[in-house]
Amino acid sequence: MIMLGLLTVASCKNEIKDKIGYKTPEFYFADAIEIKGEPLDAEYVASNVFKCFYTPYGFLGSMRSEDDKLAHLADLKTGEIKVSACSFGRGPEEILISSPDLALYGNSLYMLDQRADWIKKVEIHGDTLKTFDLQKLSLGEPMFFIEIQIVSDSLFVIFAENFNGEKKIVQVDRDNNIVDSVVYSFLDDENVDCGKCRYNVEMELSPCKKYLYVSSHLFSGISKYQIEDGKISLVDKVMLVEPKYVVKNGIPVMESENVILNNRIFVGEKYLYMTADPEKVSDMKEREKRAREEGRRESAAPGNDSYIVVFDYDLNFIKSYRVDSDVWHLALTPDPSVIYASDYRENRLKRYVLADLK
């Protein structure tokens, strides 16, 4: 996930877009089931959180460790790193960004180096990990490549933005041929110039490779796409909470009392899971201001109550769980009720059992 810009708080309240029929944050969180995680033994010393996937061989994922390795395979019981690969750097089989976007296909890890436009592949070979320079992305125009998902070993889905701010979801093959692409725009508002919008997104593909979900942090919403016969088509868009904003020079500016969820999504065999840290825009701006005054980098996690929210594939709300830590990345298991979460504050993995979820 890449930060594309800063959120501006609106002081004036004219032209605020009030939509009818949206849920309030309380709808998702008021009846949340409280659960506690079981921490694994290993505590990581790293510059960023361990984003990983559950595989039969261990947790396979990425973080920048003390020895500047970025790809790691960790023990499923203890979380201890068993083997590492892929150095931070400019050379072959190295990565220029410390927190690349990740995707899992089979038991291989795909890493998108957004600074170098490279797709790297990390494979498990017995007791070792091997890194391959898989593909240098080039789609005919200068683009910033943000998110990656894997349809097959020869077909990728990329979320990208060109220099005019236009955001696209692109299917591309191993020869950089564009199979299909659609323009991404979450707000249906003729007054909004989407090319000027800057916000975080995350993109996840369902295990069956048929449905693609894109979440918008700023507007706390999720778009659902279908991939069929090489075509990408929009199926549905859901605003989880009401977005109140004013439009200034084509840019939607969130009203200070608006609640954003800081939502991140993960798609399992049966459900879509979302982590959420609900926060008022005014509180977020104050938190960022304090961080600047103290000369420190503000964390991505606000330190508020954290939740795991469960939806079905049609984005219908199922239930939510209030967790005992700042969960950042989820590693889903074959059991839909058992997940592992990366704790942002403690930088370790925790095992959670989602009560009453079958």
Task: Please describe what each predicted stretch is.
Residues 161, 275-303, 352:
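Short, conserved, GDST-rich strand-edge loop motifs in beta-rich repeat architectures
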Residues 115-117, 124-153, 159-160:
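Asp-box/WD-like beta-propeller blade repeats and closely related beta-sheet repeat scaffolds
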Residues 48-54, 100-104, 146-152, 198-208, ...:
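Structural signature of eukaryotic scaffold interfaces centered on beta-propeller domains
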Residues 80-107, 114, 135-140, 324-328:
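Blade-loop segments of beta-propeller domains
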Residues 241-253, 316-333:
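Conserved blade-ending motifs and adjacent loop-strand segments that build the rim/top face
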Residues 169-174, 293-315:
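Beta-propeller blade signature
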Residues 20-46, 316:
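A short helix->beta-strand "capping" segment at the edge of beta-propeller domains
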Residues 38-70, 273-285:
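Beta-strand-rich domains and repeat architectures in extracellular enzymes and scaffolds
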